[in-house]
Protein backbone atom coordinates (compact mmCIF):
# COMPACT_ATOMS: atom_id res chain seq x y z
CA UNK A 1 0.00 0.00 0.00
CA UNK A 2 2.93 2.35 -0.49
CA UNK A 3 2.04 5.58 -2.21
CA UNK A 4 2.98 9.25 -2.51
CA UNK A 5 0.67 12.17 -2.08
CA UNK A 6 0.32 15.58 -3.60
CA UNK A 7 0.73 18.28 -0.99
CA UNK A 8 -2.34 20.13 -2.21
CA UNK A 9 -5.27 20.21 0.18
CA UNK A 10 -7.91 17.56 -0.25
CA UNK A 11 -11.47 18.75 -0.69
CA UNK A 12 -13.88 17.55 1.97
CA UNK A 13 -17.08 16.43 0.22
CA UNK A 14 -20.39 18.02 1.13
CA UNK A 15 -23.39 15.89 2.04
CA UNK A 16 -24.48 14.11 -1.12
CA UNK A 17 -20.97 14.20 -2.63
CA UNK A 18 -19.32 11.42 -0.65
CA UNK A 19 -18.21 8.59 -2.97
CA UNK A 20 -20.31 5.93 -1.20
CA UNK A 21 -23.03 5.89 1.44
CA UNK A 22 -23.71 7.01 4.03
CA UNK A 23 -23.92 10.69 3.16
CA UNK A 24 -24.50 11.73 6.77
CA UNK A 25 -21.72 11.55 9.34
CA UNK A 26 -21.48 8.27 11.21
CA UNK A 27 -20.87 8.10 14.95
CA UNK A 28 -17.20 7.36 15.50
CA UNK A 29 -16.43 3.94 16.94
CA UNK A 30 -13.19 2.33 18.07
CA UNK A 31 -14.46 -0.89 16.48
CA UNK A 32 -14.56 0.71 13.03
CA UNK A 33 -11.11 0.71 11.39
CA UNK A 34 -9.80 2.56 8.32
CA UNK A 35 -7.01 1.51 5.95
CA UNK A 36 -6.15 3.06 2.61
CA UNK A 37 -3.86 2.56 -0.38
CA UNK A 38 -3.56 1.95 -4.12
CA UNK A 39 -4.25 -1.81 -4.07
CA UNK A 40 -2.89 -2.14 -7.60
CA UNK A 41 -3.26 -5.72 -8.86
CA UNK A 42 -3.93 -6.63 -5.26
CA UNK A 43 -1.53 -9.17 -3.78
CA UNK A 44 -1.41 -11.00 -0.49
CA UNK A 45 0.52 -8.14 1.11
CA UNK A 46 -2.56 -5.94 0.72
CA UNK A 47 -4.72 -8.72 2.11
CA UNK A 48 -2.34 -9.16 5.04
CA UNK A 49 -2.69 -5.51 5.99
CA UNK A 50 -6.47 -5.76 5.81
CA UNK A 51 -6.44 -8.95 7.88
CA UNK A 52 -4.41 -7.36 10.67
CA UNK A 53 -6.56 -4.24 10.60
CA UNK A 54 -9.78 -6.27 10.73
CA UNK A 55 -8.51 -8.11 13.79
CA UNK A 56 -8.47 -4.78 15.64
CA UNK A 57 -12.18 -4.06 15.20
CA UNK A 58 -15.58 -5.24 14.00
CA UNK A 59 -15.69 -3.30 10.73
CA UNK A 60 -13.02 -2.43 8.17
CA UNK A 61 -13.42 0.45 5.73
CA UNK A 62 -10.86 0.58 2.93
CA UNK A 63 -9.99 3.80 1.13
CA UNK A 64 -8.87 3.33 -2.48
CA UNK A 65 -7.03 6.15 -4.27
CA UNK A 66 -8.05 7.37 -7.72
CA UNK A 67 -6.15 6.55 -10.91
CA UNK A 68 -5.40 10.24 -11.45
CA UNK A 69 -3.97 10.78 -7.97
CA UNK A 70 -1.76 7.70 -8.23
CA UNK A 71 -0.48 8.73 -11.66
CA UNK A 72 0.39 12.19 -10.38
CA UNK A 73 2.11 11.06 -7.22
CA UNK A 74 3.49 7.58 -7.79
CA UNK A 75 3.21 6.50 -11.40
CA UNK A 76 0.77 4.67 -13.66
CA UNK A 77 -1.61 2.11 -12.25
CA UNK A 78 -1.91 -1.31 -13.81
CA UNK A 79 -5.55 -1.75 -12.83
CA UNK A 80 -8.35 0.77 -13.19
CA UNK A 81 -10.11 2.17 -10.14
CA UNK A 82 -13.17 -0.06 -10.63
CA UNK A 83 -10.91 -3.13 -10.83
CA UNK A 84 -9.04 -2.12 -7.69
CA UNK A 85 -12.26 -1.46 -5.80
CA UNK A 86 -13.53 -4.88 -6.90
CA UNK A 87 -10.41 -6.51 -5.48
CA UNK A 88 -10.87 -4.77 -2.13
CA UNK A 89 -14.56 -5.63 -1.88
CA UNK A 90 -13.80 -9.29 -2.62
CA UNK A 91 -11.50 -9.54 0.40
CA UNK A 92 -13.29 -11.41 3.16
CA UNK A 93 -12.00 -8.99 5.83
CA UNK A 94 -13.14 -5.76 4.13
CA UNK A 95 -16.51 -4.33 5.12
CA UNK A 96 -16.66 -1.60 2.49
CA UNK A 97 -14.43 0.05 -0.12
CA UNK A 98 -14.29 3.86 -0.27
CA UNK A 99 -13.16 4.92 -3.78
CA UNK A 100 -11.26 8.16 -4.44
CA UNK A 101 -10.00 8.40 -0.87
CA UNK A 102 -7.32 11.11 -0.42
CA UNK A 103 -3.62 10.18 -0.51
CA UNK A 104 -2.74 12.08 2.64
CA UNK A 105 -5.13 10.40 5.03
CA UNK A 106 -7.76 12.92 6.02
CA UNK A 107 -9.31 13.30 9.46
CA UNK A 108 -12.62 14.60 8.02
CA UNK A 109 -12.86 11.52 5.78
CA UNK A 110 -12.24 8.91 8.47
CA UNK A 111 -14.47 10.80 10.91
CA UNK A 112 -17.31 11.00 8.39
CA UNK A 113 -17.27 7.23 7.97
CA UNK A 114 -17.11 6.69 11.73
CA UNK A 115 -13.59 5.31 12.01
CA UNK A 116 -11.65 6.03 15.18
CA UNK A 117 -8.38 4.54 14.00
CA UNK A 118 -6.31 4.33 10.83
CA UNK A 119 -4.09 1.27 10.43
CA UNK A 120 -1.01 1.02 8.23
CA UNK A 121 2.08 -1.13 7.89
CA UNK A 122 5.37 -0.34 9.58
CA UNK A 123 6.88 1.02 6.36
CA UNK A 124 7.29 4.75 5.76
CA UNK A 125 5.13 6.55 3.20
CA UNK A 126 5.45 10.20 2.26
CA UNK A 127 3.83 12.74 -0.03
CA UNK A 128 5.50 14.60 -2.90
CA UNK A 129 7.00 17.05 -0.41
CA UNK A 130 8.52 14.24 1.62
CA UNK A 131 6.03 14.65 4.45
CA UNK A 132 4.41 11.76 6.27
CA UNK A 133 1.13 10.75 4.64
CA UNK A 134 -0.28 9.90 8.05
CA UNK A 135 0.87 13.03 9.88
CA UNK A 136 -2.65 14.31 10.59
CA UNK A 137 -4.04 11.10 12.04
CA UNK A 138 -0.84 10.52 14.00
CA UNK A 139 -1.06 13.98 15.53
CA UNK A 140 -4.65 13.24 16.52
CA UNK A 141 -3.67 9.97 18.20
CA UNK A 142 -5.75 7.95 15.75
CA UNK A 143 -3.05 5.83 14.10
CA UNK A 144 -2.08 2.20 14.68
CA UNK A 145 0.79 0.24 13.16
CA UNK A 146 0.70 -3.36 11.96
CA UNK A 147 3.54 -5.48 10.63
CA UNK A 148 4.16 -5.20 6.90
CA UNK A 149 3.98 -8.50 5.01
CA UNK A 150 7.56 -9.42 4.04
CA UNK A 151 8.70 -10.62 0.64
CA UNK A 152 5.92 -9.20 -1.53
CA UNK A 153 5.10 -5.84 -3.08
CA UNK A 154 3.64 -4.44 -6.27
CA UNK A 155 7.13 -3.23 -7.16
CA UNK A 156 8.51 -6.75 -6.79
CA UNK A 157 5.81 -8.25 -9.00
CA UNK A 158 6.35 -5.63 -11.70
CA UNK A 159 10.06 -6.39 -11.53
CA UNK A 160 9.41 -10.09 -12.16
CA UNK A 161 7.50 -9.17 -15.30
CA UNK A 162 10.00 -6.67 -16.63
CA UNK A 163 13.08 -8.75 -15.84
CA UNK A 164 11.43 -12.04 -16.79
CA UNK A 165 12.75 -13.88 -13.72
CA UNK A 166 11.87 -17.35 -12.44
CA UNK A 167 13.66 -17.31 -9.11
CA UNK A 168 10.34 -17.01 -7.27
CA UNK A 169 9.15 -20.47 -8.41
CA UNK A 170 8.52 -23.14 -5.77
CA UNK A 171 9.25 -26.75 -6.70
CA UNK A 172 7.18 -28.43 -3.98
CA UNK A 173 5.05 -26.34 -1.65
CA UNK A 174 4.77 -29.12 0.91
CA UNK A 175 8.55 -29.61 0.99
CA UNK A 176 8.98 -25.84 1.32
CA UNK A 177 6.56 -25.79 4.27
CA UNK A 178 8.38 -28.66 5.99
CA UNK A 179 11.79 -27.04 5.47
CA UNK A 180 13.03 -29.76 3.12
CA UNK A 181 13.31 -27.40 0.17
CA UNK A 182 14.31 -23.80 -0.38
CA UNK A 183 17.30 -21.47 0.05
CA UNK A 184 19.46 -21.30 3.15
CA UNK A 185 20.59 -23.80 5.75
CA UNK A 186 18.39 -26.37 7.44
CA UNK A 187 17.40 -24.20 10.40
CA UNK A 188 16.61 -21.26 8.12
CA UNK A 189 14.49 -23.44 5.83
CA UNK A 190 12.55 -24.84 8.77
CA UNK A 191 11.93 -21.37 10.18
CA UNK A 192 10.81 -20.09 6.77
CA UNK A 193 8.50 -23.07 6.27
CA UNK A 194 6.89 -22.59 9.67
CA UNK A 195 6.31 -18.90 8.93
CA UNK A 196 4.75 -19.76 5.56
CA UNK A 197 2.42 -22.33 7.11
CA UNK A 198 1.39 -19.86 9.79
CA UNK A 199 0.56 -17.31 7.11
CA UNK A 200 -1.62 -19.86 5.32
CA UNK A 201 -3.45 -20.48 8.61
CA UNK A 202 -3.87 -16.73 9.15
CA UNK A 203 -5.32 -16.23 5.67
CA UNK A 204 -7.67 -19.19 6.17
CA UNK A 205 -9.53 -17.37 8.96
CA UNK A 206 -13.15 -16.24 8.68
CA UNK A 207 -14.45 -12.70 8.15
CA UNK A 208 -13.40 -11.68 11.68
CA UNK A 209 -9.80 -12.68 11.02
CA UNK A 210 -9.83 -14.50 14.36
CA UNK A 211 -11.70 -17.79 13.92
CA UNK A 212 -11.25 -20.75 11.55
CA UNK A 213 -12.67 -20.23 8.08
CA UNK A 214 -11.32 -21.99 4.99
CA UNK A 215 -10.13 -25.56 4.74
CA UNK A 216 -6.72 -25.98 3.11
CA UNK A 217 -5.50 -29.19 1.45
CA UNK A 218 -2.54 -30.42 -0.56
CA UNK A 219 -2.95 -33.09 -3.24
CA UNK A 220 -0.14 -35.63 -3.52
CA UNK A 221 0.20 -37.25 -6.94
CA UNK A 222 2.83 -37.99 -9.56
CA UNK A 223 4.13 -35.29 -11.86
CA UNK A 224 2.42 -36.74 -14.97
CA UNK A 225 -0.91 -36.90 -13.11
CA UNK A 226 -0.68 -33.21 -12.24
CA UNK A 227 0.39 -32.22 -15.73
CA UNK A 228 -2.18 -34.65 -17.16
CA UNK A 229 -0.32 -35.45 -20.33
CA UNK A 230 -2.48 -37.60 -22.56
CA UNK A 231 0.40 -39.87 -23.55
CA UNK A 232 3.60 -41.04 -21.93
CA UNK A 233 5.57 -40.02 -25.05
CA UNK A 234 5.37 -36.32 -24.25
CA UNK A 235 8.40 -36.23 -22.03
CA UNK A 236 11.35 -34.89 -23.97
CA UNK A 237 14.94 -34.39 -22.91
CA UNK A 238 15.86 -31.54 -25.24
CA UNK A 239 13.33 -28.84 -24.39
CA UNK A 240 14.57 -25.28 -24.57
CA UNK A 241 14.67 -23.30 -21.31
CA UNK A 242 11.65 -21.08 -20.86
CA UNK A 243 9.64 -22.62 -23.67
CA UNK A 244 6.22 -24.11 -22.91
CA UNK A 245 5.87 -27.84 -23.50
CA UNK A 246 2.65 -28.68 -25.26
CA UNK A 247 0.68 -31.89 -25.59
CA UNK A 248 0.82 -32.45 -29.32
CA UNK A 249 0.57 -36.22 -29.60
CA UNK A 250 -2.38 -38.54 -30.00
CA UNK A 251 -4.47 -39.77 -27.09
CA UNK A 252 -3.33 -43.40 -27.34
CA UNK A 253 -1.53 -45.04 -24.43
CA UNK A 254 -2.89 -42.52 -21.88
CA UNK A 255 -1.32 -41.80 -18.50
CA UNK A 256 -2.90 -43.93 -15.78
CA UNK A 257 -5.31 -42.04 -13.57
CA UNK A 258 -4.37 -41.48 -9.94
CA UNK A 259 -6.65 -40.69 -7.06
CA UNK A 260 -3.59 -39.41 -5.22
CA UNK A 261 -3.69 -38.51 -1.56
CA UNK A 262 -5.16 -35.45 0.12
CA UNK A 263 -3.33 -33.99 3.12
CA UNK A 264 -5.11 -31.35 5.18
CA UNK A 265 -2.92 -28.38 6.07
CA UNK A 266 -5.60 -26.29 7.81
CA UNK A 267 -8.96 -27.33 9.23
CA UNK A 268 -11.64 -24.71 8.73
CA UNK A 269 -15.41 -24.74 9.06
CA UNK A 270 -15.92 -27.52 6.54
CA UNK A 271 -19.11 -28.27 4.67
CA UNK A 272 -22.33 -27.41 6.50
CA UNK A 273 -25.60 -29.35 6.25
CA UNK A 274 -27.34 -28.75 2.93
CA UNK A 275 -24.41 -27.00 1.23
CA UNK A 276 -23.62 -27.96 -2.37
CA UNK A 277 -19.93 -28.66 -2.95
CA UNK A 278 -18.74 -27.09 -6.20
CA UNK A 279 -15.25 -27.15 -7.67
CA UNK A 280 -13.30 -24.53 -9.61
CA UNK A 281 -9.64 -24.57 -10.57
CA UNK A 282 -6.92 -22.60 -12.26
CA UNK A 283 -3.64 -20.82 -11.81
CA UNK A 284 -5.19 -17.74 -10.16
CA UNK A 285 -2.03 -15.87 -11.14
CA UNK A 286 -2.00 -12.14 -10.32
CA UNK A 287 -5.41 -12.69 -8.73
CA UNK A 288 -7.51 -9.89 -10.16
CA UNK A 289 -10.87 -8.74 -11.51
CA UNK A 290 -11.23 -11.56 -14.05
CA UNK A 291 -10.85 -14.21 -11.34
CA UNK A 292 -13.00 -12.31 -8.87
CA UNK A 293 -15.89 -11.77 -11.27
CA UNK A 294 -15.82 -15.44 -12.26
CA UNK A 295 -16.04 -16.51 -8.60
CA UNK A 296 -18.79 -13.98 -7.94
CA UNK A 297 -20.80 -15.34 -10.86
CA UNK A 298 -20.32 -18.91 -9.63
CA UNK A 299 -21.64 -17.80 -6.24
CA UNK A 300 -24.52 -15.98 -7.91
CA UNK A 301 -25.47 -19.02 -10.01
CA UNK A 302 -25.56 -21.22 -6.92
CA UNK A 303 -27.57 -18.66 -4.96
CA UNK A 304 -30.11 -18.37 -7.77
CA UNK A 305 -30.60 -22.13 -7.81
CA UNK A 306 -30.83 -22.23 -4.01
CA UNK A 307 -33.41 -19.45 -3.93
CA UNK A 308 -35.72 -21.53 -6.11
CA UNK A 309 -35.39 -24.31 -3.51
CA UNK A 310 -36.34 -22.01 -0.62
CA UNK A 311 -32.85 -21.62 0.86
CA UNK A 312 -33.32 -17.95 1.76
CA UNK A 313 -36.69 -18.16 3.51
CA UNK A 314 -36.80 -17.03 7.13
CA UNK A 315 -37.81 -20.52 8.19
CA UNK A 316 -34.84 -22.13 6.42
CA UNK A 317 -32.45 -19.54 7.84
CA UNK A 318 -33.77 -20.08 11.36
CA UNK A 319 -33.33 -23.84 10.98
CA UNK A 320 -29.70 -23.49 9.91
CA UNK A 321 -28.89 -21.20 12.82
CA UNK A 322 -30.56 -23.54 15.31
CA UNK A 323 -28.64 -26.49 13.89
CA UNK A 324 -25.16 -24.98 13.57
CA UNK A 325 -25.21 -21.70 15.48
CA UNK A 326 -24.79 -19.56 12.37
CA UNK A 327 -26.16 -19.01 8.89
CA UNK A 328 -24.11 -19.87 5.82
CA UNK A 329 -24.29 -19.74 2.01
CA UNK A 330 -25.81 -22.51 -0.14
CA UNK A 331 -22.56 -23.35 -1.94
CA UNK A 332 -19.22 -24.53 -0.58
CA UNK A 333 -16.71 -23.46 -3.23
CA UNK A 334 -13.49 -25.47 -3.45
CA UNK A 335 -10.68 -23.84 -5.46
CA UNK A 336 -7.93 -25.99 -6.94
CA UNK A 337 -4.57 -24.27 -7.46
CA UNK A 338 -2.02 -25.61 -9.95
CA UNK A 339 1.67 -25.92 -9.06
CA UNK A 340 4.21 -23.54 -10.59
CA UNK A 341 5.63 -26.29 -12.77
CA UNK A 342 2.21 -27.13 -14.20
CA UNK A 343 1.49 -23.53 -15.17
CA UNK A 344 4.93 -22.98 -16.66
CA UNK A 345 4.59 -26.23 -18.60
CA UNK A 346 1.57 -24.88 -20.45
CA UNK A 347 2.16 -21.11 -20.50
CA UNK A 348 5.95 -20.94 -20.75
CA UNK A 349 8.04 -17.72 -20.47
CA UNK A 350 8.20 -16.98 -16.72
CA UNK A 351 4.61 -17.72 -15.79
CA UNK A 352 3.31 -17.87 -13.15
CA UNK A 353 4.31 -14.39 -12.02
CA UNK A 354 3.22 -15.32 -8.50
CA UNK A 355 4.38 -18.63 -7.06
CA UNK A 356 1.95 -21.24 -5.74
CA UNK A 357 2.23 -19.97 -2.15
CA UNK A 358 1.44 -16.39 -3.17
CA UNK A 359 -1.39 -17.47 -5.44
CA UNK A 360 -2.82 -19.60 -2.66
CA UNK A 361 -2.89 -16.70 -0.22
CA UNK A 362 -4.61 -14.49 -2.79
CA UNK A 363 -7.24 -17.15 -3.34
CA UNK A 364 -7.74 -17.80 0.37
CA UNK A 365 -8.45 -14.16 1.14
CA UNK A 366 -11.33 -14.06 -1.36
CA UNK A 367 -14.73 -14.17 0.32
CA UNK A 368 -16.19 -16.39 -2.42
CA UNK A 369 -13.84 -19.29 -1.59
CA UNK A 370 -14.41 -21.83 1.21
CA UNK A 371 -11.60 -24.32 0.63
CA UNK A 372 -8.34 -24.46 -1.30
CA UNK A 373 -6.52 -27.47 -2.73
CA UNK A 374 -2.85 -26.83 -3.52
CA UNK A 375 -1.30 -28.95 -6.26
CA UNK A 376 -4.51 -29.64 -8.17
CA UNK A 377 -4.27 -31.35 -11.59
CA UNK A 378 -4.41 -29.39 -14.84
CA UNK A 379 -6.90 -31.84 -16.34
CA UNK A 380 -9.58 -33.27 -14.08
CA UNK A 381 -9.68 -37.05 -13.88
CA UNK A 382 -12.53 -39.19 -12.60
CA UNK A 383 -10.27 -40.57 -9.89
CA UNK A 384 -9.52 -37.05 -8.61
CA UNK A 385 -13.14 -35.89 -8.63
CA UNK A 386 -14.49 -39.03 -6.97
CA UNK A 387 -12.01 -38.83 -4.09
CA UNK A 388 -12.23 -35.13 -3.19
CA UNK A 389 -12.35 -34.66 0.61
CA UNK A 390 -15.99 -33.55 0.42
CA UNK A 391 -17.14 -36.29 -1.98
CA UNK A 392 -17.71 -35.78 -5.68
CA UNK A 393 -18.69 -32.15 -6.39
CA UNK A 394 -22.19 -31.53 -7.68
CA UNK A 395 -20.77 -29.03 -10.17
CA UNK A 396 -17.46 -28.05 -11.77
CA UNK A 397 -17.47 -24.47 -13.02
CA UNK A 398 -15.24 -22.87 -15.61
CA UNK A 399 -15.36 -19.93 -17.97
CA UNK A 400 -15.57 -20.01 -21.75
CA UNK A 401 -11.99 -20.79 -22.71
CA UNK A 402 -10.26 -21.98 -25.88
CA UNK A 403 -7.68 -24.52 -24.78
CA UNK A 404 -5.49 -24.22 -27.87
CA UNK A 405 -3.04 -25.64 -28.72
CA UNK A 406 -4.26 -28.57 -26.61
CA UNK A 407 -5.44 -31.66 -28.45
CA UNK A 408 -7.78 -32.66 -25.63
CA UNK A 409 -10.30 -31.05 -23.29
CA UNK A 410 -9.13 -30.77 -19.65
CA UNK A 411 -12.80 -30.74 -18.60
CA UNK A 412 -13.90 -33.80 -20.58
CA UNK A 413 -14.47 -35.88 -17.43
CA UNK A 414 -16.80 -33.46 -15.59
CA UNK A 415 -18.65 -32.99 -18.87
CA UNK A 416 -19.07 -36.77 -19.17
CA UNK A 417 -20.30 -36.88 -15.56
CA UNK A 418 -22.78 -34.12 -16.43
CA UNK A 419 -21.49 -31.86 -13.65
CA UNK A 420 -19.72 -29.29 -15.83
CA UNK A 421 -21.17 -25.78 -15.71
CA UNK A 422 -19.96 -22.87 -17.80
CA UNK A 423 -19.90 -19.23 -16.75
CA UNK A 424 -20.70 -16.90 -19.64
CA UNK A 425 -18.35 -14.16 -20.77
CA UNK A 426 -18.39 -11.06 -18.61
CA UNK A 427 -16.95 -7.55 -18.51
CA UNK A 428 -13.65 -8.69 -16.99
CA UNK A 429 -13.37 -11.91 -19.01
CA UNK A 430 -9.98 -11.05 -20.49
CA UNK A 431 -8.36 -9.68 -17.34
CA UNK A 432 -5.82 -12.33 -16.37
CA UNK A 433 -2.09 -12.61 -15.80
CA UNK A 434 -1.29 -12.30 -19.51
CA UNK A 435 -3.42 -9.17 -19.82
CA UNK A 436 -1.77 -7.59 -16.79
CA UNK A 437 1.70 -8.36 -18.14
CA UNK A 438 0.65 -6.86 -21.48
CA UNK A 439 -0.45 -3.67 -19.71
CA UNK A 440 2.90 -3.50 -17.96
CA UNK A 441 4.86 -4.05 -21.17
CA UNK A 442 2.80 -1.48 -23.06
CA UNK A 443 3.71 1.18 -20.54
CA UNK A 444 7.19 -0.18 -19.89
CA UNK A 445 8.97 3.17 -19.90
CA UNK A 446 6.59 4.59 -17.32
CA UNK A 447 6.87 1.52 -15.13
CA UNK A 448 10.66 1.54 -15.38
CA UNK A 449 10.63 5.13 -14.18
CA UNK A 450 8.38 4.08 -11.31
CA UNK A 451 10.86 1.32 -10.43
CA UNK A 452 13.83 3.69 -10.55
CA UNK A 453 12.06 6.13 -8.25
CA UNK A 454 11.69 3.31 -5.74
CA UNK A 455 15.35 2.36 -6.03
CA UNK A 456 14.76 -0.66 -8.24
CA UNK A 457 16.73 -1.56 -11.33
CA UNK A 458 14.90 -0.94 -14.61
CA UNK A 459 14.69 -3.52 -17.32
CA UNK A 460 17.68 -3.28 -19.65
CA UNK A 461 18.17 -4.27 -23.26
CA UNK A 462 19.28 -7.79 -22.35
CA UNK A 463 16.14 -8.43 -20.27
CA UNK A 464 14.00 -7.21 -23.16
CA UNK A 465 15.85 -9.49 -25.57
CA UNK A 466 15.26 -12.47 -23.28
CA UNK A 467 11.54 -11.77 -23.04
CA UNK A 468 11.17 -11.37 -26.80
CA UNK A 469 12.98 -14.66 -27.39
CA UNK A 470 10.81 -16.50 -24.86
CA UNK A 471 7.67 -15.05 -26.41
CA UNK A 472 8.88 -16.12 -29.87
CA UNK A 473 9.43 -19.68 -28.63
CA UNK A 474 6.01 -19.70 -27.02
CA UNK A 475 4.33 -18.59 -30.27
CA UNK A 476 6.23 -21.28 -32.17
CA UNK A 477 5.03 -23.93 -29.72
CA UNK A 478 1.44 -22.76 -30.12
CA UNK A 479 1.70 -23.03 -33.91
CA UNK A 480 3.19 -26.50 -33.62
CA UNK A 481 0.42 -27.52 -31.25
CA UNK A 482 -2.33 -26.33 -33.55
CA UNK A 483 -1.05 -28.49 -36.40
CA UNK A 484 0.17 -31.42 -34.30
CA UNK A 485 3.79 -30.91 -35.34
Predicted regions and their residues:
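Nucleotidyltransferase catalytic core that binds NTPs
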Residues: 1-485
Amino acid sequence: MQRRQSARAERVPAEGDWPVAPQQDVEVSEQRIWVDGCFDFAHHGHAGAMLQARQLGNELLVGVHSDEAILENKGPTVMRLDERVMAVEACRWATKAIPKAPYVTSLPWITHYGCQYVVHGDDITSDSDGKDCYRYVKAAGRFKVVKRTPGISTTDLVGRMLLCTKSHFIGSLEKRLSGDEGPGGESERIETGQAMLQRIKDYATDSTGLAPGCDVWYWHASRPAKLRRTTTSNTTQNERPGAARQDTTSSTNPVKEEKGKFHQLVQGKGVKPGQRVVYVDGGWDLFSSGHIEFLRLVTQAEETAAKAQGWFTEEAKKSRIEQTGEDYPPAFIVAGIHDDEVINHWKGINYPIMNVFERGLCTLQCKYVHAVIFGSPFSLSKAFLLTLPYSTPVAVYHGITKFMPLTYDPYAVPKALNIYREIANHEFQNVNAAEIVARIMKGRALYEERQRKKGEKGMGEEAERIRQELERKQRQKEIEGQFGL
